[in-house]
Amino acid sequence: MEIFVGTDIMEVERIKKILEKRPHFLERIFTEKEREFLRKKKNPWPHLAGFFSAKESVSKVLGTGIRGFSWQDIEIIHNEYGKPEVVLKGKAKAIAAEKGIKEIKLSISHTSDYAMSVAIAVGGENS
């Protein structure tokens, strides 16, 4: 058994600046479900930074960074209690399967200035 951990921190202002320079960033990085969630927020910026941070954390759990798969292969959703959950698709899902990872646990926190996330998974033989 092996434990996989990924963490990331993101400045909210940085994500704002990225979107100002690259308007298509939102569609390239985030799935329709993620964008729909963000549209419902009065102040989406901390949540946007949190989602981006979460995708980075999950990519670190997979051990690849965002290489070999699309940003949209990692989707962040929320259950009925508002808890963030990870849905893997495409090549990201295949990489997780190769590592014996069946589920990734995720925590996201943010303030008005920063968002951070931690992703943890158990994999390997007999996981």
Swiss-Prot record:
Cofactor(s) this protein requires: Mg(2+)
Keywords noted in UniProt: Cytoplasm, Fatty acid biosynthesis, Fatty acid metabolism, Lipid biosynthesis, Lipid metabolism, Magnesium, Metal-binding, Transferase
GO cellular component: cytosol
InterPro entries: 4-PPantetheinyl_Trfase_dom, 4-PPantetheinyl_Trfase_dom_sf, ACPS, P-Pant_transferase_sf, Ppantetheine-prot_Trfase_dom
Enzymatic reactions: apo-[ACP] + CoA = holo-[ACP] + adenosine 3',5'-bisphosphate + H(+)
GO MF terms held by the record: holo-[acyl-carrier-protein] synthase activity; magnesium ion binding
Similarity-based family: Belongs to the P-Pant transferase superfamily. AcpS family.
Protein name per its UniProtKB record: Holo-[acyl-carrier-protein] synthase
Highest classification ranks of the organism: Bacteria, Bacillati, Bacillota, Clostridia, Thermoanaerobacterales
